């Protein structure tokens, strides 16, 4: 059975589970995945170029959502929206130049408030801008990880939804003050489901296992910290039942970074 067939089966099973839960949130979230998963599969099937386009488009969406979330001025958002997708595109066309492009992206967003002479909010703009570049740079992993990225995407997605459902069902101690609604029980359930997905897809390696077990929950908490800092519930509201794209990719971003660092 191919990876695509397995993922299609999991998506179908998820739809049944979402329907049985009778929770509007899970049904809407499944609908979003039902639309998004075929797009992801098609892009990754197209090879490195398709992966770069997918990652670049995701980077643009995340940068726009993040700019609105942190209330960056429009000029900062524009520079960030150009800088972020350049990282995965460079990973495709000139991977050896990736460090230089990443440095240029950081310098570009840092210079905006400096050149604007912002004496009151400049430091905040600089910090938020540089955080955005660093946070979204792991999207280069969609290109660099090759076929492994599909298994990582599936495992993190399943771990994320299982953690949410398991935490609500089992309850118990809260995971972190950053996200009081999340529970340790959900973390354990999500980790088991994510690692099981890697095993089923034949992609269970130490690097990917750590990326799923540690990167997924920590990535979720990182976004929770940012949202709490700016007093927001979701990164956006355009994605039915799921807030924004960043709310769905937060776990994947840190997982991609860990997989890249550990050399999947």
Feature-to-residue mapping (PLM):
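Interfacial loop-to-transmembrane junctions
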Residues: 228-252
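Acidic, glycine-rich loop-and-beta core segments that form the ion-binding/anion-interacting portion
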Residues: 223
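Membrane-embedded alpha-helical bundles of polytopic integral membrane proteins
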Residues: 2-183, 187-195, 199-214
């Amino acid at each position: 059975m191919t990876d695509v067939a397995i993922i299609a089966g999991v998506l179908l099973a998820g739809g049944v589970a979402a329907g049985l839960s009778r929770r509007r949130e899970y049904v809407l979230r499944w609908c979003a995945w039902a639309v998004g998963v075929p797009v992801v599969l098609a892009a990754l099937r197209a090879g490195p170029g398709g992966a770069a386009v997918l990652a670049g488009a995701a980077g643009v969406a995340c940068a726009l959502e993040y700019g609105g979330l942190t209330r960056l001025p429009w000029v900062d958002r524009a520079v960030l929206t150009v800088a972020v997708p350049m990282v995965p595109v460079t990973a495709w066309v000139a991977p050896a130049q990736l460090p230089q492009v990443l440095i240029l992206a950081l310098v570009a967003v840092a210079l905006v408030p400096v050149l604007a002479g912002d004496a009151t909010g400049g430091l905040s703009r600089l910090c938020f801008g540089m955080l955005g570049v660093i946070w979204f740079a792991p999207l280069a992993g969609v290109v660099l990880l090759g076929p492994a990225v599909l298994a990582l995407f599936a495992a993190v997605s399943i771990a994320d939804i299982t953690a949410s459902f398991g935490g609500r069902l089992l309850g118990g101690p809260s995971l972190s003050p950053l996200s009081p609604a999340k529970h340790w029980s959900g973390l354990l359930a999500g980790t088991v489901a994510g690692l099981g997905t890697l095993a089923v897809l034949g992609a269970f390696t130490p690097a990917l296992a750590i990326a799923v077990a540690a990167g997924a929950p920590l990535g979720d908490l990182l976004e929770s910290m940012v949202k709490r800092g700016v007093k927001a519930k979701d990164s956006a509201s355009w994605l039915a039942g799921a807030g924004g794209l960043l709310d769905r990719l937060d776990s994947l971003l840190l997982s991609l970074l860990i997989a890249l660092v550990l050399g999947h």
